[in-house]
Amino acid sequence: MLKSLQLQAQMTEEFGACVFDVTLDCEDGAPVGDEAAHAVLVAALARDAAPAARVGVRVHPVDHPAFANDMATIAGEAGHRLTHIMLPKVESVDDVLRAEKTLQGTSAAHLPLQVLIESPAAVHRAFEIAAHPRVQSLSFGLMDFVSAHGGAIPASAMASAGQFTHPLVVRAKLEIASACHAHGKVPSHCVVTEFSDMVAMQAAASRAAREFGYTRMWSIHPAQIRPILEAFGPTQDDIEVASKIIAAAADADWAPISFEGALHDRASFRYYWQVLERAHSTGRSLPAAVCPWFTPSVSLCP
């Protein structure tokens, strides 16, 4: 966990902005029987993180005996430094309501919740879960989802290639992405477990971003971060086109414009503005014409 925070600080200095979140883990990261001590450690790491750090915590599921203590210790002691709480194994909006009520009993009632969707029932309720105002993001938990099918889905569906071809996994991914976009939330793609295979990582991240509608992706190893940023960021050509269209639109007070023989109006302005936002959030360099809109992170601009 400490190495992840150190890498985040190094890349923030490199890019001039924080380009990825760190989620400290209490669910799978805590030894059985040592959950309370692990929560204290996580709270301390979050409190001591760099000022520009974006740090969240994955607590235990709401029905786990350690959940209440996780929330009291971590949200209560480090809530002012956290960007989010990650809830694993959410089955319905009732789990979100329970977590929200628990948060309200701490000094971090403002914190958004990021939710892990990890079962067929949760996928079925993804739209309802995404609609809750406290929910910021839905993430797909691939391995738990496959395991929840009792052997009906082969192990190959958990691999980097198979997870994009098995029909039930593909359906789940698309449902989650669609639910997020319907309610203005962030869809976060699942991990790739082959952490030493950068070709597989790049291919999976590219498909998640280009074909499945995901705007973020989990990593499980530092070597995966740059391929994810590369895949989820726009190309330099995309950035140049978006910058020219947005600059021309601003000059026209956002009235329809003609650009290279094509009509653009507010619908396409929104799209190209989102291209620039993705460029900024993934550490891309921005043309001078659009830099003023992205201050104070002026170091990304020429």
Question: In which residue ranges do the predicted regions lie?
Answer:
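Expand to "…catalyze enediolate/carbanion chemistry for C-C bond making/breaking, isomerization
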Residues: M1-P302
